[in-house]
């Protein structure tokens, strides 16, 4: 543990390192490196399960505070769909897309099917920007409109689209982009 901290400098840097980078540190084998790369993923799942219980998302601030921890240590763009009931209670939080450092593929069909299967009244879409700002790109805006329109056809409201970058987030609803 000390060798890893000495090499990478911080615990954050250790958890963000790849298996290959960790195995370059003397005394760190494949098993240890693999275990350490799983810790952030396990932590995210634990936080999701813990926070899902009785979570109400009535505002962009509620949603942003829920979402920021889910993106900790992510090195690629990830898209989540938060399915809500009629009282803005969280039914589920599903990963619906994963990509590379600066882009994630999003299937409008998968989003609609997920929302329908969860019996959502409304949904919040979210994705992260890895090494940039939490500002929407033109492509983010166009994709959001396509998803909003598809959801409306089946009677589901897109309540918000939140972009997370580090500890910051931007709400499409608050920005007038929905």
Give each language-model segment a name:
Residues 107-109, 138-146:
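Charged helix-capping and loop-helix junction motifs
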Residues 11-25:
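A short amphipathic alpha-helix within small helical-bundle interaction modules
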Residues 122-133, 163:
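Histidine-centered catalytic micro-motifs
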Residues 145-178:
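Divalent-metal-activated hydrolytic enzyme cores
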Residues 88, 125, 160:
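Conserved hydrophobic/aromatic pocket- or pore-lining residues that grip, position, or stack substrates
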Residues 43-64:
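Long, charged amphipathic helices and adjacent flexible linkers at domain junctions
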Residues 64-118, 122:
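Histidine/lysine/aspartate-rich catalytic loop segments that bind and position anionic ligands
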């Amino acid at each position: 543990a000390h060798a890893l901290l000495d090499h990478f400098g911080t615990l954050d840097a250790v958890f963000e390192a790849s298996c290959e980078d960790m195995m370059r540190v003397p005394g760190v084998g494949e098993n240890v490196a693999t275990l350490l790369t799983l810790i952030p993923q396990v932590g995210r799942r634990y936080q999701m399960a813990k926070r899902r219980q009785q979570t109400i998302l009535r505002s962009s601030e509620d949603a942003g505070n829920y979402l920021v921890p889910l993106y900790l240590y992510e090195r690629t763009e990830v898209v989540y769909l938060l399915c809500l009931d009629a009282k803005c209670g969280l039914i589920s939080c599903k990963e619906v897309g994963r990509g590379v450092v600066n882009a994630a593929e999003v299937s409008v069909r998968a989003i609609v099917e997920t929302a329908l299967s969860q019996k959502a009244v409304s949904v919040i879409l979210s994705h992260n920007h890895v090494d940039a700002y939490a500002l929407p790109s033109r492509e983010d805006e166009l994709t959001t409109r396509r998803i909003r329109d598809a959801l409306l056809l089946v009677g589901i409201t897109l309540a918000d689209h939140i972009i997370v970058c580090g500890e910051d987030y931007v709400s499409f609803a608050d920005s007038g982009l929905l």
